[in-house]
Amino acid sequence: ADSCVLFVEAHGATMLFPGDIPARAELQLIASGSLPEQIDILVAAHHGSDTSSSQTFIDRVDPEHTVFTTKQANRFNHPSPRVLARYQKSGGALWDTGRHGAMCFRKRPARNLSATAMRIGYLPYWAK
């Protein structure tokens, strides 16, 4: 599969957006040597489907936060329970946009990265 992979480093935080790359492309990305030691924010490849997120890749990028871009009650059952279990094993925070809504990450000098889920604690105007 052809997919755009984007790595961003800003304000002391690292973010990786692997698009829809399959597990074999994850291994190629690791072999390229272009990844930093640890990723702060990872958007899970292919919405957390079984085609991506190999244990080797997860162990290598060691994400502090992983975001699964899904739709509430999606028909594909993303993220896959097997993929979710692999990320849970890594110990980082897991976020699902289908459940948590939009995500806001903030990095301030000399502070840890903070995450805010817009669907938790923020009610839309019609729900107030």
PLM region spans:
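Active-site-proximal loop/helix segments of hydrolase catalytic cores
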Residues: 1-79
